[in-house]
Amino acid sequence: MTNIRKPPLLKIVNHSFIDLPAPSNISAWWNFGSLLGLCLVIQILTGLFLAMHYTSDTMTAFSSVTHICRDVNYGWLIRYMHANGASMFFICLFLHVGRGLYYGSYTYFETWNIGVILLFAVMATAFMGYVLPWGQMSFWGATVITNLLSAIPYIGTTLVEWIWGGFSVDKATLTRFFAFHFILPFIVAALVMVHLLFLHETGSNNPSGLISDSDKIPFHPYYTIKDALGIFLLLLLFMTLVLFFPDLLGDPDNYTPANPLNTPPHIKPEWYFLFAYAILRSIPNKLGGVLALIFSILILMMFPILHVSKQRSMMFRPLSQCLFWILVADLFTLTWIGGQPVEHPFITIGQVASIIYFVIILFALPIISMLENKLLKW
């Protein structure tokens, strides 16, 4: 057995997945890392097979997707696995980030910051992928979101036209989006390796937030079997979605070919961007909205700076727990608002929810943490 662990490549695998010392008390919330790895593999494989049949031309893109679904062997399955795989990816991502916030994993600066960059990269990939079927929502989503860059002073308009490759979203835009959508997942995979590299420098956090060096167990067989259960449950949920409700999370407008002369009644992105879209729409000023949109994700990088509690995890901090779950409820509210038309009362609800989002993170959590520090001495 020791001989198997000697070759350089196998040594890397061994140190990462077999003999890796892991805390003995990590819960099911630590399963999402491996599930995200599975989602990435599914997305790259299904995407590769879709790319074999897809054509990135405005005249034939929509038809090629139809051709994949109707004429290619199991093309419908590959297409729906890819579309719903993105949704599963983001569900796991949000839960993974939420776990990091709850248990204070953000104190591993490098791992956390690479993770936030990963989140941005995956969001960019998903956005460009949504444009490729060239349906109504693809076209108008691309137009609206890329047009936001025109809010940048001086260079905005030129930048947008440079990204479009013309004066509107057209053939050049679709071709370059396809090229970027193809290459980005491999960049994401490389970033994942860096993410794991930094994680294995420090070791995993655990629910208590305490140093667990005195109580480590080998990753295999304990966590390999635990991850296998997580993978089985994810695949069960995923294939139920793909085979029974493939269009549940999609937009019916995207079954209409893109038409620059006809605007859909409600332009909205995929469900996983709705919370950020609601924050964007809640600010009347264009540049302000764009900055709020970017900052709503970038604010994750501020968590290590804003952490003032003497305890790392929220496990023993009931007041912070309360705020955390209010934040989760607020994000659900923002997601709902993002999918609603821009009219009363949704505008006001969106503005209030956006303010609550930033207030909780920037002010409420640090203040409550300081109060809890005081209560420790009580």
Curated annotation (Swiss-Prot):
Cofactors: heme b
GO MF annotation: an example: ubiquinol-cytochrome-c reductase activity
InterPro entries assigned: Cyt_b/b6_C, Cyt_b/b6_C_sf, Cyt_b/b6_N, Cytb/b6-like_sf, Cytochrome_b, Cytochrome_b_C_euk/bac, Cytochrome_b_N_euk/bac, Di-haem_cyt_TM
Result when mutating residue 167 to S: In strain: Isolate B9 and Isolate D1
Signal peptide: none
Keyword Isomerase: no
Binding site for heme b b562: 82, 181
Similarity-based family: Belongs to the cytochrome b family.
Name used for this protein in its record: Cytochrome b
Lineage: Eukaryota, Metazoa, Chordata, Craniata, Vertebrata
